[in-house]
From Swiss-Prot:
<keyword id="KW-0067">ATP-binding</keyword>
<dbReference type="GO" id="GO:0008716">
    <property type="term" value="F:D-alanine-D-alanine ligase activity"/>
</dbReference>
<dbReference type="InterPro" id="IPR011095">
    <property type="entry name" value="Dala_Dala_lig_C"/>
</dbReference>
<dbReference type="GO" id="GO:0046872">
    <property type="term" value="F:metal ion binding"/>
</dbReference>
<dbReference type="GO" id="GO:0071555">
    <property type="term" value="P:cell wall organization"/>
</dbReference>
<dbReference type="InterPro" id="IPR011761">
    <property type="entry name" value="ATP-grasp"/>
</dbReference>
<dbReference type="InterPro" id="IPR000291">
    <property type="entry name" value="D-Ala_lig_Van_CS"/>
</dbReference>
<feature type="binding site">
    <location>
        <begin position="135"/>
        <end position="190"/>
    </location>
    <ligand>
        <name>ATP</name>
    </ligand>
</feature>
<feature type="domain" description="ATP-grasp">
    <location>
        <begin position="105"/>
        <end position="304"/>
    </location>
</feature>
<dbReference type="GO" id="GO:0005524">
    <property type="term" value="F:ATP binding"/>
</dbReference>
<keyword id="KW-0963">Cytoplasm</keyword>
<feature type="binding site">
    <location>
        <position position="271"/>
    </location>
    <ligand>
        <name>Mg(2+) 1</name>
    </ligand>
</feature>
<comment type="similarity">
    <text>Belongs to the D-alanine--D-alanine ligase family.</text>
</comment>
<keyword id="KW-0547">Nucleotide-binding</keyword>
<feature type="binding site">
    <location>
        <position position="271"/>
    </location>
    <ligand>
        <name>Mg(2+) 2</name>
    </ligand>
</feature>
<comment type="pathway">
    <text>Cell wall biogenesis; peptidoglycan biosynthesis.</text>
</comment>
<dbReference type="InterPro" id="IPR005905">
    <property type="entry name" value="D_ala_D_ala"/>
</dbReference>
Length: 309
């Protein structure tokens, strides 16, 4: 595909969410890749520029590299649709559902896809929660998550009443709705999605209790295994599960699905990511490379999806 077919491209990065720093790194990597392909691409931080400038400066399309609220939750996608500006990734509905961990799990559960047991606590309900009863109901060990944050921000593990109360208070600093999810003991996997098809599975190995913010972006002791060491049948079934999970929430274009496998060999869907990280430590580029797709070609493929909008 000729580079001039894309016209003038805005790489949207930064923003105002708690994931701003990660977004800046993702966006700059994407920008570098697009420019290397000869594409007329420019950085655009919506925290510093009005969206009207996209029209005034005659941009033709947008590569969204915003993570978290305001960029991955459907609001930016809706604004760009009003401007009739083609953009990468899922639409308003897919992004909104993917960002909301509670709604995402409700949909997966409703269509028969496997996900760990959970309960929802609102910020207003924290003081009334019977933490001991909730722990017992969910198997004695849980992970608490803000419903609408990414990069593992605000997450913590609890295995007694005091730690659950503290975990709820911590998560409430980031969201009014909190997900209390049964802890799944086992290995964590992630599956990139590109054009509706799963990329090679990656198995994550970290000495941390879980794949938290530090393990994702700061630690040097996190190991990534791709190929993941699964049998051919397990690799195929996990890829199919990821494709179904992404489609169930209305995801499109590209994304990532995170999964746990318990010690009995059962799969449990964790989360959907509709604008995954694109930093030097990010997982979708890693899987794409194993599939034979170099980073610059990957970002061009993702951008090419906007030509169909």
């Amino acid at each position: 595909m000729k580079a001039n077919a894309f016209g003038k491209v805005a790489v949207m990065l930064g923003g105002t969410s708690a994931e701003r720093d990660v977004s800046l790194k993702s966006g700059m990597a994407v920008l570098k890749g697009l420019v290397a392909k000869g594409i007329d691409a420019h950085a655009f931080d919506p925290a510093a520029h009005s969206l009207q400038e996209l029209v005034e400066q005659k941009f033709d399309r947008v590569f969204i590299a915003l993570h978290g609220r305001g960029g991955e939750d459907g609001s930016m996608q809706g604004a760009l649709q009003i401007l009739e500006m083609p953009y990468t990734g899922s639409d308003v509905l897919g992004c909104a559902l993917g960002m909301d961990k509670v709604r995402c799990k409700q949909i997966w559960h409703s269509v028969g896809l496997p996900t760990a047991n959970w309960r929802v606590v609102t910020q207003a309900e924290i003081e009334q929660v019977n933490v001991e009863a909730m722990l017992q109901e969910l198997g004695g060990r849980v992970i608490v998550k803000p419903a609408r944050e990414g990069s593992s921000i605000g997450m913590s593990i609890a295995d007694n009443g005091r730690s659950l109360a503290l975990a709820l208070q911590h998560a409430a600093e980031f969201d009014d709705d909190l997900l209390v999810e049964q802890w799944v003991e086992g290995a964590e996997y992630t599956i990139g999605i590109l054009e509706g098809k799963a990329l090679p599975v990656i198995r994550l190995q970290t000495p941390h209790e879980f794949y938290d913010f530090e393990a994702k972006y700061q630690a040097n002791d996190t190991q990534y295994h791709c190929p993941a060491g699964l049998s051919d049948d397990d690799e195929a079934s996990l890829r199919t599960l990821a494709e179904r999970a992404f489609a169930a929430i209305g995801g499109s274009g590209w994304g990532r699905i995170d999964v746990m496998r318990n010690n009995a060999g059962e799969w449990f869907l964790l989360e959907a990511n509709t604008v995954p990280g694109m930093t030097e430590k990010s997982l979708v580029p890693m899987a794409a490379k194993v599939a034979g797709l170099q980073f610059n070609d990957l970002v061009e493929r993702i951008l090419a999806q906007t030509l169909e909008r």
